Amino acid sequence: MVFIDACFRKKTPYTPIWMMRQAGRYLPEYMEVRNKAGDFLTLCKNPKMAAEVTLQPVEILDVDAAILFSDILVIPLEMGMDLRFEKGEGPVFSKPVRTWEDLGSLYEFPEEKLTYVYETIKIVRKKLPKDKALIGFSGAPWTLATYMVEGSGSKTYAAIKKLIYTDPEFMHALMIKITEAVKAYLVKQIESGVNAVQIFDSWASALEKEKFFEFSWDYMVDIAEFLKERYPEIPVILFPKGIAGYLDDIYGKFDVFGVDWGTPIDLAKEKLGNKYVLQGNMEPTRLYSKEATKEGVEKIVEVMGAKEGHIFNLGHGMLPDLPVENAKYLVELVHDLTRR
C-alpha cells in the first residue's frame, strides 16, 4: 500500500493523498445515503451504510486511503452521555461532566459497545481494493474532554479551563479515563482490520503551551506509544490543530505528524521533518478554485519535494459545498506532480 509505505518513509511511486472529511456532504452520493439513514448518528451506527460512505471517496476520487466513517463523540456517547446533534449548533451533551460524581457515572468500557464501528471496518476492508489503506481514528483525549465538560463546541473553553486551574486532579482523572477508553477503542479498530490510525486533537490550540503538553500532548503520546509497542506495523498519525508555536517541544514515538493549514509547511519541515513523516496541509477553501488548488499544491510540493517524507492532505476538513470536480483534480494533480 502506497499510503502505508509513505507513513514509514519507504519508497513510493508518488506522494499519496487522502483528505480529512473526504466522506461528506460535498458528495451527492454521500447525501443520498445520509438522507436514507435519516440522521447523522443513525448513519454512524449502521455498518452497511457507514461502510458505503467510507468507500465512496476511494471510488469517486481515487484517494490512496479510506478513513473510517464515524464520529469522535461515539466514545462519550457509549460512556453513557446523552448526545444529540442540533441543526446549526452541532453536537450537544445534555448533561456535561463537571464533578467527581459525573465522572464516576461514566461507563468505563465504551469500546465494548462500539461493535457497529468494528463491523463497519470489517465490511470496508473486504470491499476496499488491496492497494488502498483503511485509516481508523479517534478524537484525542483533550478534544473529547472539551466536548464532555463544555457540553458542546465552545469559543472560550471557559468551563474546562476553569477546571484545569481550580481542580487539576479532577481533570487528570477525566483525562486518564478517556485515554484508557481511546487505547481500547483503537486496539479494537486495529484488530478489526484498519491499516493505520489517526488521533485528532481539534481543540489543541485552546491551551497555552505548558498546559497543552500537560493535558493534551502527554496523553496523545501515551496512546501512540501504547499502540506502537503492540502493533509496530500500524502507523500512528497525530494531528494537533493550531500549535505552530509549540513545534520545538514535540516529542514521542509515533510515525506521522499532521500539519494544519495555519502552520507553514516549511516551518513544520524544519522543526519535525527529520523525526516524523509530515501530512498536510493545503488550505481547504483553495478547492473552490482550480487555479488556487494548483497554486496550493505546487507550493507544498516545492517545500516537501516529490520524495519520501510527505503525505498530501488538507490542513483541515473538506467543506460541504466544495466542487467534487476540484477534489478529483486535486488527487490527479498531486499524483502527477509527485510521480518519481
UniProtKB/Swiss-Prot annotation:
Keyword Lyase included in the entry's annotation: yes
UniProt main location, coarse: cytoplasm
Pfam (any one): URO-D
Catalytic activity: uroporphyrinogen III + 4 H(+) = coproporphyrinogen III + 4 CO2
Site note Transition state stabilizer, residues: 71
Record-linked InterPro entries: UROD/MetE-like_sf, Uroporphyrinogen_deCO2ase_HemE, Uroporphyrinogen_deCOase
GO MF assignments: uroporphyrinogen decarboxylase activity
Binding site for substrate: 21-25, 71, 147, 202, 316
Gene Ontology cellular component annotations, sorted alphabetically: cytosol
GO annotation terms (biological process): protoporphyrinogen IX biosynthetic process from glutamate
Classification via Gene3D superfamilies: 3.20.20.210
PROSITE patterns recorded: UROD_1, UROD_2
Subcellular location: Cytoplasm
Domain of life, per lineage: Bacteria
First-level EC class: lyase
Pathway: Porphyrin-containing compound metabolism; protoporphyrin-IX biosynthesis; coproporphyrinogen-III from 5-aminolevulinate: step 4/4
Alphabetical UniProt keywords: Cytoplasm, Decarboxylase, Lyase, Porphyrin biosynthesis
Known EC number: 4.1.1.37
Role: Catalyzes the decarboxylation of four acetate groups of uroporphyrinogen-III to yield coproporphyrinogen-III.
PANTHER family in the record: METHYLTETRAHYDROFOLATE:HOMOCYSTEINE METHYLTRANSFERASE RELATED, UROPORPHYRINOGEN DECARBOXYLASE
Subunit organization: Homodimer.
Family from the record: Belongs to the uroporphyrinogen decarboxylase family.
Descriptive protein name: Uroporphyrinogen decarboxylase
Originating species: Nitratiruptor sp. (strain SB155-2)
Biological classification of the source: Bacteria, Pseudomonadati, Campylobacterota, Epsilonproteobacteria, Nautiliales
